[in-house]
Amino acid sequence: MSVRSQALVPLSTEQQAAWRAVAETEKRRHQGNTLAEYPYAGAFFRCLNGSRRISLSDLRFFMPSLTAEELHGNRLQWLYAIDVLIETQGEVCLLPLPGDAAERLFPSVRFRVRERSRHKSALVMQKYSRQQAREAEQKARAYQALVAQAEIELAFHSPETVGSWHARWSDRVAEHDLETLFWQWGERFPSLAGMERWQWQDMPFWQVIAEASLAAREAGHAVREMERWMVPNKLREAA
């Protein structure tokens, strides 16, 4: 396909946003401006729909079926993959992006990379700072460590005391991660048997926590006492 014939094909909204993201980010880089983390990904969504903070809804542009659980622990990998995709103009498409992401934004990529092997992609990837990759990994690991710590602490709570756990972690761990931990933890407590996650999906999480505490109080002394004995000894000894 000639350059002229490619130019005659109108660009879709998302393709225009991708090319604008490349142009704007390269301009800022050449001007010596400080770039934010994952600048190409940020510029793409800003040009596409005005998003200043990339959300789950934004990432569903690439995978409509993406859930909060699937994104859990993988957000940085998604942002990194999108950043690489835009900067390389579709030549490098990393997981977890779907295989058609490159052609969706840069249709001409199939003509540019048809004769290139994965070895070429690896060479392109070498221009990215190893330090940046390490920092991203360290941030991801640090966050996962926080989530793990929150999960461990939750194990030492009963529905009576879960409110204090939420207060401690609500500003340190993402709400969707706290929700996942809570619903998994709550499955073993009789006082919470009547609470189904789907019934509360549109309610603020703090209200779910409040309802859990209320359910424990209304369950009766015998149930509360049993649930206290269901948690590890550390909580009972500290009480």
Swiss-Prot record:
InterPro entries per record: Uncharacterised_PsiA
Keyword annotations: Plasmid
Signal peptide start and end residues: none
Matches recorded under Pfam families: PsiA (PF06952)
Keyword Plastid found: no
Function text: Not yet known.
Family: To PsiA protein of plasmid R6-5.
Record protein name field: Protein PsiA
Organism listed in the record: Escherichia coli (strain K12)
